């Protein structure tokens, strides 16, 4: 459960990164594909080379969904309901991949905003990413 300070911390992080959705999203995906190559199996039709338009486009969607969840932090489930349906019923993404993506996103935030990512903010962002992952996997049950 996200506390009031967690919510404030998360909103503060996303206020800093909102204008960089495409870049940070692409970097997150590239990092995930390199670190966890098994995640590439969900993107057989993508050009997975650094800087590809497909990676940038999907990265922008990923970070856009995180921004949407942060903007509706009191009801993440409602804000990501359609995305949850898509990933569970159509794409059938292995739920562990949401955790892997979250870890890579944390690294990207740390690289670009080291002074923002204090231990407290890191913990809040991690809790938020876990909450997002839980919402995205809720319809698997």
Swiss-Prot record:
The keyword Signal does not apply. Pfam families: Globin (PF00042). InterPro entries: Globin, Globin-like_sf, Globin/Proto, Hemoglobin_a-typ, Hemoglobin_oxygen_transport, Hemoglobin_pi. O2 binds at residue 58. Red blood cells. One of its GO terms (biological process) is hydrogen peroxide catabolic process. One of its GO terms (molecular function) is peroxidase activity. Keywords: Heme, Iron, Metal-binding, Oxygen transport, Transport. Residues 1-141 form the Globin domain. Heme b binds at residue 87. GO terms for cellular component: blood microparticle; haptoglobin-hemoglobin complex; hemoglobin complex. Belongs to the globin family. Heterotetramer of two alpha chains and two beta chains. Involved in oxygen transport from the lung to the various peripheral tissues. This is Hemoglobin subunit alpha-A. It comes from Vultur gryphus (Andean condor). The lineage of its organism: Eukaryota, Metazoa, Chordata, Craniata, Vertebrata.
């Amino acid at each position: 459960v996200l506390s009031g300070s967690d919510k404030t911390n998360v909103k503060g992080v996303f206020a800093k990164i909102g204008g960089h959705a495409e870049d940070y999203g692409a970097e997150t995906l590239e990092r995930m594909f390199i670190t966890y190559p098994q995640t590439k199996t969900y993107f057989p039709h993508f050009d997975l080379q650094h800087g590809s338009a497909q990676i940038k486009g999907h990265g922008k969607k990923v970070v856009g969904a995180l921004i949407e969840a942060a903007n509706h932090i009191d009801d993440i489930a409602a804000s990501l309901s359609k995305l949850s349906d898509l990933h569970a019923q159509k794409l059938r993404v292995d739920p562990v991949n949401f955790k892997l993506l979250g870890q890579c996103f944390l690294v990207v935030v740390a690289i670009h905003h080291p002074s923002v990512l204090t231990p407290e903010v890191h913990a809040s962002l991690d809790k938020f990413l876990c909450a997002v992952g839980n919402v995205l996997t809720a319809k698997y049950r």
